[in-house]
């Protein structure tokens, strides 16, 4: 399981699995139902990281689990209706994403490239106006999972960097929280 997000309707969870999207119920007993896959012919690709936006859409990234040098990953949008689509292909290691509190823009990491991208989200859920938000050096570590707080500050976990860093919306680092581990993958608050 790469991620687990509570459904807006309170009816269980959505999950990201090796095999694709799934609906999960914990009660009265564990039950898992497939909910679609954007990579049925690519057994080495798996869902990796995801976030839900204020409209109940889940933005999920995928990666080649066997060879991350291959740009077989993608960023997909799973709609509340259950339909999904790949919104960007050609990604190595999809991490993040982080969605602005007002839902108007999103950040996404391609960890293999040490690069964070920014997109504007249109009213109908399309990603447009892609720009490079920030490129990190090898010494800084690899940008992995991330989130935004209610003020729109960006928090990124750094694999190999042993820390979580806070950035303003323009990408200027505000602070660093060092942790007693090197492989930090994500955070939640």
Role assignments for model-derived ranges:
Residues 1, 33-40, 82-89, 129-136, ...:
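A short beta-strand motif characteristic of beta-propeller blades
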Residues 7, 13-19, 58-69, 106-112, ...:
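Conserved beta-strand positions in repeat-built beta-propeller and related beta-rich domains
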Residues 1-13, 41-58, 87-106, 136-154, ...:
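Beta-rich, blade/repeat-based domains predominating
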């Amino acid at each position: 399981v790469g991620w687990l997000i509570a459904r807006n309707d309170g009816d269980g969870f959505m999950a990201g699995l090796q095999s694709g999207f799934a609906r999960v119920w914990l009660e009265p007993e564990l039950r898992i139902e497939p909910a679609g896959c954007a990579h049925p012919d690519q057994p080495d690709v798996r869902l990796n990281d995801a976030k839900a936006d204020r409209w109940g859409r889940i933005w999920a990234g995928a990666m080649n689990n066997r060879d991350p040098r291959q740009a077989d990953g993608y960023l997909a949008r799973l709609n509340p209706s259950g339909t999904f689509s790949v919104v960007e292909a050609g990604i190595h290691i999809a991490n993040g994403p982080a969605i602005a509190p007002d839902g108007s823009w999103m950040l996404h990491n391609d960890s293999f490239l040490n690069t964070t991208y920014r997109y504007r989200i249109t009213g109908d859920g399309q990603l447009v106006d892609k720009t490079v938000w920030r490129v990190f050096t090898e010494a800084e570590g690899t940008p992995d999972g991330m989130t935004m707080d209610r003020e729109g500050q960006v928090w990124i976990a750094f694999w190999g960097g042993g820390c979580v860093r806070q950035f303003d919306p323009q990408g200027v680092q505000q602070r660093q929280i060092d942790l007693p581990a090197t492989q930090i993958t994500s955070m939640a608050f």
